[in-house]
């Protein structure tokens, strides 16, 4: 599988065995990472294509391409890479756990229409519903997804969540576009003010963010773990 590295915003579940990543450590997958452009704060299309070609020459061509992750300020270049990756027989998934509400509100990107085969998502982050998840895709993948979910991964479902999710989806239909837009505006405003008072906010070149997230380089004050602990104590 090829995915974003954790330093580039990928989720730990997409990581290598040696990084305690779920995909590598638990599922035994051979993991490679997309090339990342730190200036643009997103995936580097040309370098990613070159890497895939190099992996092909080593007979290590990934079977899965995983867009999305835990931290990404800007949409991933799905349209720019989808045809290329499919031309190398990869299944393309988009991990929309953190940005599902922004996608539903039409304010981020539209992965399935941009070329992904499937999209996984949370129902409890930017979509503001009860905790849970969904797998979205096309009819051609329906049976394989069903078999993977049961008996492959689950044995039951949480029926008590369904009413809450229905209400959350109804609210998203009514208020989702405005909510997503304001969420992004809030993140931009926070980033700009943090920058104004002297913090090193990443992504300034592109307006800091087009998602709900703001990323700050805290190395002037200490390492990330220490700063996180200090903020927890101060909260």
Feature names for model-found ranges:
Residues 2-200, 229:
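Conserved PLP-enzyme active-site core in the AAT-like
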Residues 188-235:
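Conserved C-terminal alpha-helix-loop-beta "cap" of PLP-dependent enzymes
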């Amino acid at each position: 599988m090829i995915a974003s590295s954790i330093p580039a915003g990928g989720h730990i579940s997409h990581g290598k065995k040696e990084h305690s990543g779920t995909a590598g450590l638990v599922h035994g997958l051979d993991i490679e990472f997309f090339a990342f452009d730190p200036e643009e704060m997103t995936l580097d299309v040309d370098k990613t294509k070159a890497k895939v070609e190099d992996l092909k020459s080593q007979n290590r061509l990934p079977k899965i391409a995983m867009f999305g992750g835990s931290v990404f300020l800007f949409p991933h270049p799905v349209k720019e890479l989808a045809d290329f990756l499919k031309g190398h027989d990869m299944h393309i998934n988009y991990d929309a756990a953190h940005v599902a509400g922004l996608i539903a509100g039409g304010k981020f990107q539209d992965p399935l229409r941009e070329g992904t085969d499937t999209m996984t998502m949370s129902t409890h982050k930017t979509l503001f519903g009860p905790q849970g998840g969904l797998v979205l895709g096309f009819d051609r993948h329906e049976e394989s997804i069903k078999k993977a979910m049961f008996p492959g991964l689950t044995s039951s479902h949480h029926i008590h969540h369904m009413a809450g999710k229905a209400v959350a989806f109804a609210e998203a239909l009514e208020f989702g576009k405005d909510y997503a837009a304001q969420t992004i505006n809030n993140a931009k405003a926070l980033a700009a003010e943090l920058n104004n008072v002297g913090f090193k906010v990443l992504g300034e070149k592109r307006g800091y963010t087009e998602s709900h997230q703001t990323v700050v380089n805290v190395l002037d004050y200490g390492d990330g773990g220490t700063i996180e602990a200090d903020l927890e104590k101060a909260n």
